[in-house]
């Protein structure tokens, strides 16, 4: 009854706080505060439950140590300093509980990490404390060699290099956000992806090790837009590519693939929010052609240039598909192909 009463008081406290926002203008600040309440309530409830079970758990509020800088990027120095100090204050604890996703910004306001959610929090925490391993539990047995929502009878990939995992995450593997890999990679901490529904399954281990000369997986990214700028007059001029890329930067639109020729530049994007404005600005430099509903297929593995034959095998596998662009060389871990299709399943 004691813990049940504490849980009721916890929920009431947070709901009363949310109700205060109904009396004033609802701004972006209030929205972020409301979004944080789920993490705050669930972790508080879990901590009470564990205490009731006799486990000496301690709740460490993420809002006391997780902070972003003025560029909305995590501040690893601040996070490490504050978190270690908080942990040192509870040396007798059996278990620590904290929130994912939420943080404070550089001005002390409640905010969130925006990308990667709780997985990003786990990676940042693991890096801050120098963990032996970071575990991320999901509803699937690690990263698969194909998207199980599209391809039947896929199988988990047991080992991936940090770069391979980042490529798969960026090009369609929904199990992990590419941002989550970086803190672990910078601190050389292995990341293990495990399945909550099958805790005995080995999952996927992500580290700085790779299996040489092996293709690991294929990912697909749909709803891609291809933009081609054709300009024989401007292409060889100094600074032409910089000017083209600056247009995309001005509209905060990331580029997925780039290819160049003597008379043109082709790029792909997956964010069409500012497509019209981007095209208008690009027309200053040449003729612009836009193709929508494209798909990027990304083949990931140890694809260094001295591993002869991989590129030919990949292209041969796509012999019946009209490939529009091929990107290879920017990374030793992927080959990307662009083609027209209504869906990656096709």
Language-model segment annotations:
Residues 225-231, 294-303, 335:
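Short, hydrophobic beta-strand segments
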Residues 212-219, 242, 276-320, 325-327:
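Intrinsic, low-complexity N-terminal interaction/targeting segments
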Residues 263-270, 296-297, 333-338:
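A generic structural motif
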Residues 1-176, 181, 333:
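Nucleotide/pyrophosphate-binding catalytic subdomain
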Residues 339-346:
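Conserved small/polar residues in nucleotide/adenosyl-binding loops
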Residues 191, 197-290:
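A glycine- and small/hydrophobic-rich beta-loop-beta segment
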Residues 173-178, 183-187, 191-201:
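Conserved glycine-bearing catalytic or ligand-binding loops at nucleotide- and phosphate-handling centers
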């Amino acid at each position: 009854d004691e813990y049940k009463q504490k849980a009721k008081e916890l929920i009431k406290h947070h709901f009363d706080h949310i109700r205060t926002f109904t009396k004033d203008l609802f701004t972006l600040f209030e929205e972020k505060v409301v979004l944080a309440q789920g993490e705050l309530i669930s972790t508080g409830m879990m901590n009470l439950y564990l205490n009731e079970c006799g486990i000496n758990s301690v709740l460490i509020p993420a809002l006391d140590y997780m902070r972003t800088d003025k560029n909305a990027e995590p501040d690893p120095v601040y996070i490490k300093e504050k978190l270690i100090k908080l942990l040192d204050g509870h040396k007798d604890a059996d278990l620590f509980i904290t929130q994912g996703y939420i943080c404070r910004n550089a001005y002390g306001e409640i905010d969130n990490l925006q990308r990667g959610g709780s997985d990003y929090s786990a990676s940042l925490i693991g890096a801050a404390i120098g963990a032996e391993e970071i575990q991320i539990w999901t509803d699937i047995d690690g990263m698969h060699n194909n998207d199980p929502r599209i391809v039947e009878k896929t199988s988990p990939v047991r080992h991936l290099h940090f770069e391979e995992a980042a490529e798969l995450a960026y090009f369609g593997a929904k199990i992990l956000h590419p941002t989550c890999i970086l803190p672990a990679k910078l601190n050389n901490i292995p990341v293990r992806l495990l399945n909550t529904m099958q805790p005995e399954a080995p999952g996927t281990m992500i580290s700085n090790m790779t299996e040489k000369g092996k293709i690991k997986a294929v990912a697909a990214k749909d709803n891609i837009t291809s933009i081609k700028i054709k300009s024989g007059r401007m292409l060889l001029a100094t600074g032409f590519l910089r000017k083209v890329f600056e247009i995309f930067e001005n509209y905060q639109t990331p580029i997925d693939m780039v290819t160049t020729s003597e008379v043109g530049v082709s790029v792909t994007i997956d964010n069409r929010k500012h497509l019209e404005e981007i095209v208008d600005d690009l027309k200053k430099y040449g003729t612009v052609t836009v193709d929508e509903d494209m798909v990027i297929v990304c083949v990931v593995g140890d694809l260094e240039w001295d591993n002869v034959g991989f590129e030919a095998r990949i292209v041969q596998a796509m012999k019946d598909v009209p490939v529009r662009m091929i990107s290879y060389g920017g990374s030793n871990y992927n080959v990307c192909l662009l083609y027209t299709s209504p869906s990656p399943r096709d």
